[in-house]
Amino acid sequence: MSPSVSSPQLRHTKSNRAISRIDRTDPLALALQPPANEAPADKYARLHQEKLAKQRSDEIDKFLKQHQEDRATHGLASSPSTSVDGANFKKGRVYKMVLLGQAGAGKTTVLKQMRLLYDPPAHERERRGWTKIVLLNLTSSVRVLLETLSLYHDQRLERKSSELSRLESSTSASTSTSASASSPKHVDTESQPNDATRLELAKQLGTTKKINTSSLPWLTHIPSVVQLERALRTELGAFGEEAVLSASSDEAAITNQKVRTRLDAQGSSSIRGEKSPLVLRPGWQERLFTYARRSLSLTQNGRAAAARRETDGGDSQSESEKDNSETLKLLRAIRPEVLALWNDDAGCRALRKRGLFLDGQSDAATSYFLDNYSRITDAAYRPTDEDILHSRVRTLGVTEDVFRVDRSLIYRIYDVGGSRSQRAAWAPFLDDIESIIFLAPLSAFDQPLVEDCSTNRLADTFTLFNQIVTNPLLEHATMILFLNKIDLLEKKLRQGVQLHKYWPEYVGDNDFEAVWRWFRAKFRDALRRAEDEVNLDQTSRRRLYVHTTVATSTVQIRAILMSVKDSILRENLKLTGLVG
């Protein structure tokens, strides 16, 4: 008699046999089968991501089903056009769009604006979840301010030390020459070092020739702010956190030297690379906003219980408030000194005049958050739309959103990561795309690409645009171009940053209107050349819809999105032959 097999073992054996049968007959099942040696932690992570993806898919299906029922209720399902060509009708009803552009161009900000316009309830549900991200952006801005001013004072110290050494060596050389001279010679007293100047420099430098922390007490806050930022990033699940904020001493020295060089450069308009972007792992929206909604529900439904706990001396704070309390405690403690630096410090004013804290120059809108420091750290703080729009979170991978624009139009929008390393992942999402919104940050005309410091950011944008308009898969897609960060471009030009210094082919005036129109013409020429290469006739040529944008301006983007909708309608009518 064969040995008995326990029930769990039998079920496991049958399961493996079933999988083997499926694998032999179904290539898709073979491709999707998890690794045989999958670790428990990897399995848990995979199942969690599959669960989130399934929930998202079910939500979209429910949304589309509800929309179809609404159409049937209004008698639209039986219209001749839908019954004759249901596929084309569905294609026109669910309109596929993709947001393209390099990292930091403003794609995610535009997507936030779309959610605010087309799905206000979802935007409102997520509002509470942005609190921690806003606090992280504020913390990063504080660190940027303190470290930049530290380097500024360090640079001044180096200059004074160099000047003192020069004066001392000059005095020594003069004394030696006078003592060894065999006959008296005329001495130029005007070229002699000024003793008063030398004494003043020596007094300022002191014996250590280091920054006097007693005169700059805010320097002592830098380690605690760095530690707080690291903790917030870790809590949010920032990608690559160890590589970002744990640089070696050699790397830190190199970074400091680069910043010193930029501080010393005349006409420099930004400090680049002073902070790393907040790159969160895939699924951060579900984790953060689901937690925020749960906390909000607990807060709303448990007010009576909270009041009782408070009466009994218990802690009445919600989970979210507890998590943020330590952050707020530190930010409130250093607030007076930071605001005094930001508003009154002479060195900070000098750097601000040179544009070193210009919003959009880095991944944090530094000046925006510092200007709103007091409001954000208030006890009754609640993120505003402006706070959410200015908060920077870099997209990792691809996110998909579905918005009902009106009864007959739904946008399915893909937001893809724009860094060079992520562009290879775009291809699967470009199939059957009907419209492309391409964002070009014009204010980056004088900035290097983060991934390659030898490449100009805007030059990389033109290269990317050329690759898109020459892609055969996208030859029928409507092209919509957002010339973004136009306000920062105007500020730079007014501050005297010369375009021809970075773009020698530009020969016009350093005038805002002339500059942005010149860039618009370059994009149009790029599209025209791409179509000339494939010998398109005049009737088949695409129109490039161009808009100058400030992605954080809700009023402007709302008007532009309405214009985009009209452009889409116009292109659809053209395809049906109803318009020429």
Swiss-Prot record:
Domain G-alpha: 93-579
Gene name linked to the record: GPA4
Subunit structure of this chain's protein: G proteins are composed of 3 units; alpha, beta and gamma. The alpha chain contains the guanine nucleotide binding site.
Biased composition range(s): Polar residues: 1-10
GO molecular function: G protein-coupled receptor binding; G-protein beta/gamma-subunit complex binding; GTP binding; GTPase activity; metal ion binding
Region (G2 motif): 387-395
Protein name listed in UniProt: Guanine nucleotide-binding protein alpha-4 subunit
PANTHER family per record: GTP-BINDING PROTEIN ALPHA SUBUNIT (PTHR10218), GUANINE NUCLEOTIDE-BINDING PROTEIN SUBUNIT ALPHA HOMOLOG (PTHR10218:SF360)
Stretches for region G5 motif: 549-554
Sequence positions that bind Mg(2+): 395
Residue ranges of the region described as Disordered: 1-28, 160-196, 302-325
Cited function: Guanine nucleotide-binding proteins (G proteins) are involved as modulators or transducers in various transmembrane signaling systems.
Any single GO CC term annotated in Swiss-Prot or TrEMBL for this entry: heterotrimeric G-protein complex
Chain coiled-coil ranges: none
Region named G1 motif: 96-109
Region annotation (G4 motif) ranges: 480-487
One family name in Pfam for this protein: G-alpha
Binding site for GTP: 101-108, 389-395, 415-419, 484-487, 551
Positions of the UniProt region annotated as G3 motif: 411-420
GO biological process: adenylate cyclase-modulating G protein-coupled receptor signaling pathway
Lineage: superkingdom: Eukaryota
Species, as recorded: Mycosarcoma maydis
Assigned keywords, A-Z: GTP-binding, Magnesium, Metal-binding, Nucleotide-binding, Transducer
Family according to the record: Belongs to the G-alpha family.
InterPro entries: Gprotein_alpha_su, GproteinA_insert, P-loop_NTPase
Keyword Magnesium among UniProt keywords: yes
Annotated Low complexity bias: 167-183
Gene3D superfamilies registered for this protein in UniProt: GI Alpha 1, domain 2-like, P-loop containing nucleotide triphosphate hydrolases
